[in-house]
């Protein structure tokens, strides 16, 4: 199964399981979004699957609907926060060399700062 697993060493899995605190802004059965603890913009949230998948490189065909749902949640949050017109950034880092600090696939939604 590659990087798909439940792990006690993952801070994002701990947040999903409510073992670690976070300011949750969205949650459904498969996806969670919460504010980044080190925001790089006035709006900076992380959108992630509750299922532990380490990186994009660990995705399998069965994860296609789940990854599509990440984008739909980001779209929903952008509309909710009225940032659709001004624009926003969606960012995914892959591996340490790509800037990924937590081994749990996640998308950054950022807005409110000029890039």
What residue spans do the PLM features occupy?
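HIT superfamily nucleotide-processing domains
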Residues: 1-115
